[in-house]
Amino acid sequence: MKNPLWGGRFTVSPSDIMKKINESISFDKILYEEDISGSIAHCKMLVNQKIISKYEGQLIIHGLEVIQNQISSGTFEFSTDLEDIHMNIEHHLKKMIGNIAGKLHTARSRNDQVATDFKLWIRKSIVKLETLLHELQQTILNIAEANYDTIMPGFTHLQIAQPVTLGHHLMAYFEMLKRDCSRWQDLHKRMNQCPAGSAALAGTSFPIDRHFIAQELKFDSPTENSIDAVSDRDYVIEFLSNASICIMHLSRLAEEIILWCSYNFKFITLSDNITTGSSIMPQKKNPDAAELIRGKTGRIFASLNQILVVMKGLPLAYSKDMQEDKEPVFDAANNLMLCIEAMNSMLNNITINKSNMLKAAEHDYSTATDLADWLVKNLNLSFRESHETTGQIVKLAEQNHCKLHELTLEQMKTIIPSITEDVFSILSVKNSVDSRTSYGGTAPANVIEAIKRGKLYLSNITTLHSENNM
């Protein structure tokens, strides 16, 4: 059939293959709430500016509200012949109220319409993501508080480096998620200008009030340049960049969970309700949720790359290529939310095996740095000299198949004759951890203070809980 909305200059209808490649209703119908909100704000502005009558505006708005209820209830029938969410809604509005429906599109284009819809949807998603991240942060805070002095090995190069506390280790992820939340808030501020009223690219000759629409939709202001308004997808790229950084943080934690629950570590035990089994090996208990978070990370990274490649060669202003911006964002947002919830569920159902963590922390000479520091403080060696000396003492312990604190004073004196009995006071992992009192260090007293700061952050954080706060 001939397209009723843009078919005036065409003599034949689009071919089936053209309809198939051109349609976006299969995925952009998710924008129906934003599209209707934008249309209602636009309609109110048209009435205020006397571009359409109050009666016409009432008919249009009532019709849009009916359509929204139909879509929400699942009774609305979408058509691929009508391409996208905008034309599906307008077509059904025309069926309901007649040709007056056509006045809704006065002084606007689908170019500024979709940009407005998409910003509204991304803004709403930021609220959801930030809320989920704060819930995950609270879970991390709870576990850290319960384990502020639980000793575990800290790693570099995945080899035991120095003893730390589990609370301190987990608070590192708390800080990562804080930065993620900050990035979402920054994006909201940067993207919160309204494209509506920019029309196709050049603005419009109608006496519209763009500030009114922006205010109705809770934007900070209208966009400053109509060409930029319809061709800008920086906010899409930034959304996917933020999502990529956030899922990278979750992937790192997921990787540690996978390692920690393995037979080789046995630091933690995952609950049965967040693990799966093997179809052939009955003994298996697999950390599939963590592995899927790690796997979905690549998927979200790919979404960012996809939109960068789409946008890199587009001249101003709008090109149909930009229709390809929706699916990667929808997919990334949904998967990131799922991964945050899965991580929260895993951590809320985790068992900490403290004794195994402590035993591991006591291996591989994890207090060697404490010994090197002691030599500097007490024997007036330079750190380079103490580093060399400590390395020799570690080698001596290796040769004797013992831990550092199991060496005798006489054995140590063969390396450095001036060493004294006091050295043994710093060779235990507990003393090592307790001594790390520099700001941001792993000492339990520091962890307690970090947890207090974390609680204050969560109680004071300004989150975008609803569209009314935007």
UniProtKB/Swiss-Prot annotation:
Pfam families recorded: ASL_C2, Lyase_1
One GO MF term: argininosuccinate lyase activity
CDD domains per the UniProt record, alphabetical: Argininosuccinate_lyase
Pathway(s) it belongs to: Amino-acid biosynthesis; L-arginine biosynthesis; L-arginine from L-ornithine and carbamoyl phosphate: step 3/3
HAMAP family attached to this UniProt entry: Arg_succ_lyase
Record family assignment: Belongs to the lyase 1 family. Argininosuccinate lyase subfamily.
Protein's UniProt name: Argininosuccinate lyase
Organism: Ehrlichia chaffeensis (strain ATCC CRL-10679 / Arkansas)
